[in-house]
Amino acid sequence: MIKKAIILCGGTGSRMFPLTHSVNKQLLPILDKPMFYYPLSLLMLCGIREYVFIINKNQENNFSKALGNENDLGIRVKFVVQESPLGLPDAFSISRKFIKNQSIAMILGDNFFFGSMLSPLIRKSFKLKSGCNIYIYPSNKPSSYGVVEFNKKNKIKKIVEKPKKTNSNSIITGLYTFDKNVVNFTKKLKPSKRKELEIVDLINLFPPSTRAGGQDD
């Protein structure tokens, strides 16, 4: 059963400049709450109580103020600084002391998830014993994302990052769950052409029989 989660709140937020000139994108307000509150709330609804926030340098105080008293929320939070943007899987490497050889969930701090059956679906996937779970959604422009391709038995065949051609319209979202092997698998990754570790490459290291996809319409 997954009991811990990583929330990714780093990055440069370059596409939202100048709003992100002096503050992380995930701290920007959406209605009456900072952006990161929404993915955090989703995981809290699913029973997660221990978190590590991956943040940029000199941002811990800002996130602490935005979060408020974690005891009032009934959660425990640690902050880990990502010194440079080395890709999503780097979060597992720098959080290995937090993970402690356990299964873990990871969510992007700037993503929004909504659906009538979403929480039950996620709770079910949090019973993960081995392998990994990814959450997929249909897209009209799949080539702009990581695309999940299936075999004839509707099992995940492979995941391709921004393919030029594909017969699938299922894209990966910003929520993942991995078993205790994730830290060791991350060590096997090599930087892509972008000079970053790619989440797609990490998922593809898990045996096909242990990869599962979830979708809430």
Sequence positions of predicted segments:
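Conserved N-terminal catalytic core of the sugar/cofactor nucleotidyltransferase
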Residues: 1-7, 15-21, 28-29, 33-108, ...
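Active-site glycine-centered loops adjacent to acidic/histidine catalytic or metal-binding residues
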Residues: 11, 110, 138
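Alpha-helix/helix-capping structural signal
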Residues: 11, 58, 180-181
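A structural signal for short hydrophobic beta-strand segments in well-ordered beta-sheet cores
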Residues: 27, 148-150
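A short acidic, often aromatic-flanked loop/helix-cap motif at beta-alpha or helix-coil junctions
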Residues: 85-88, 141-142, 165
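Catalytic-core segments of class I nucleotidyltransferases/pyrophosphorylases
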Residues: 105, 119, 126, 155-207, ...
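Conserved donor-nucleotide/metal-binding helix-loop-beta segment in metal-dependent transferases, i.e.
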Residues: 115-143
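Ala/Thr-enriched low-complexity intrinsically disordered regions
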Residues: 210-212
